[in-house]
């Protein structure tokens, strides 16, 4: 794989996909990436995460979905520890419990209104151009890596019925959850600056306020 990448001969493969029912009756497209594709995708995510750990975790008091583990900042030096047990994200169950606790605490404070929303078909609707632009402008990802990821995302897009070039990232991978958080990072900054109680678990968002007007703003 490393030889293919260095010679720029690596080509992503079209992955198998299937639908998983959601509680609301809709369907989620699950993508099973081939091993080499998954390794490349995760390696890119690892590099971005370790190089930008501080900026990516500054909002962790408000963000609870797919939160980076502290070991991420050590980057490839983790490979020097043969006994290390490393996970890219903190465990989701404890994070979701913390998210729920924060929501309940805001309710107990007596805040009268809550805006509760999520982004329909979030992973399937992420524009590749937007993601690649953020990776380039804010995280200084090199052009050859952007080209590689762009090619991969196009091949991985859509459903078994066909591609959706330029739109959608594959669900069921940690790298995609990481990229999804990157897309929402600027939204986090905007809402946190408004100083309203704001909490997010991936694309599941809660904003609390004393009036409907301040939430509409």
Role assignments for model-derived ranges:
Residues 13-43, 60-86, 159-181:
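Short, conserved non-catalytic motifs in the polymerase core
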Residues 49-114:
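Active-site-proximal segment of RNA-dependent polymerases
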Residues 38-50, 151:
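Short, hydrophobic/amphipathic alpha-helical patches that form generic packing surfaces
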Residues 6, 15-19, 27-33, 97-107, ...:
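Catalytic micro-motifs at enzyme active sites that drive phosphoryl/nucleotidyl and oxygen chemistry
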Residues 4-23, 147-157:
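Reverse-transcriptase-like RNA-dependent polymerase core
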Residues 85-202, 206-216:
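Conserved polymerase palm-domain catalytic core
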Residues 31-32, 43, 53-58, 125-128:
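Short, conserved acidic/polar surface loops in the N-terminal third of protein domains
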């Amino acid at each position: 794989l490393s030889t293919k990448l260095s010679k720029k001969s690596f080509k992503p493969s079209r992955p198998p996909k299937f639908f998983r029912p959601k509680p609301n009756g809709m369907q989620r497209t699950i993508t099973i990436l081939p091993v080499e594709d998954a390794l490349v995708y995760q390696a890119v995510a690892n590099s971005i995460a370790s190089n930008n750990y501080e900026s990516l975790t500054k909002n962790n008091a408000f963000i609870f979905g797919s939160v980076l583990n502290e070991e991420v900042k050590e980057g490839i030096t983790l490979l020097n520890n043969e006994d290390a047990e490393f996970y890219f994200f903190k465990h989701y169950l404890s994070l979701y419990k913390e998210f729920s606790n924060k929501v309940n605490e805001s309710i107990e404070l007596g805040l009268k209104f809550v805006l509760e929303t999520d982004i329909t078909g979030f992973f399937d609707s992420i524009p590749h151009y937007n993601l690649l632009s953020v990776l380039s402008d804010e995280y200084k990802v090199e052009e050859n890596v952007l080209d590689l990821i762009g090619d991969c995302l196009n091949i991985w897009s859509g459903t078994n019925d066909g591609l959706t070039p330029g739109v959608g990232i594959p669900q069921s991978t940690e790298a995609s959850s990481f990229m999804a958080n990157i897309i929402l990072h600027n939204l986090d900054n905007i809402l946190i600056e408004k100083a309203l109680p704001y909490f997010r678990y991936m694309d599941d968002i809660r904003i609390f306020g004393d009036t409907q007007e301040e939430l509409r703003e």
